[in-house]
Amino acid sequence: SGIALYGDKLENREMVKNEGFYLLDATVLSATTIEEDDLLQNIALAIKENHKKVKIWNLSLSVKIAIEEDTFSDFGVVLDHLQKTYGVLIFKSGGNGGNFMKKLPKGKLYHGSDSLLSVVVGAINDERYASNYSRVGLGPKGTIKPDLASYGGELLLGDNGEMIMKGVKSFSRNGNIASSSGTSFATARISSL
């Protein structure tokens, strides 16, 4: 929410012209691990209970299973159903990967990122190229995913094999300015439009 509300100010540059808006914190994850079915039930309940006052949803989380080429994930199908049923729009993060640390090709988008109705968001760096960690499509049946990309920082492989972060500024849990990188940050920025 820090990036959605204050992203431009924190970066000291105009990217999306953040304006004030009503923000609902709909916690759908437990403090421990959660099964995909339970997560989907929590998301469905949050949308069902709040769809009349909240039309735009930022879903910056993933089930860490790569999408398939010919089959849509249950996660993606449920997200599409919820959007049709309740007249909402979901902005979904595409997911992060670390293949660049092993000099391997980028991984496929995660489950849920194959939703046809969701706006799936990847991350770009300061040079406006896809961030090293940002996962890629295509979606099932050749669908184009992600739909959009926005600034999400960058992770680099250093000369000594260490990870170097050029992060996005937001707020830490204790309210201090901190930085990190990820498609979740890019998704928050886009959903604030």
Give the role of each language-model region.
Residues D25-V28, L59, A123, S150:
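Hydrophobic side chains in beta-strands
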Residues K108-S191:
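Extracellular S/T/G-rich loop segment that most often corresponds to the catalytic His/Ser-adjacent loop
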Residues V28-S115, N174-T187:
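Substrate-binding/access-modulating region of protease and related hydrolase catalytic domains
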Residues S1-E36, G87, D114-L117, G139-K145, ...:
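Subtilisin-like serine protease catalytic core
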Residues L5-K9, S150, S191-L193:
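Short glycine/serine- and small hydrophobic-enriched flexible loop segments
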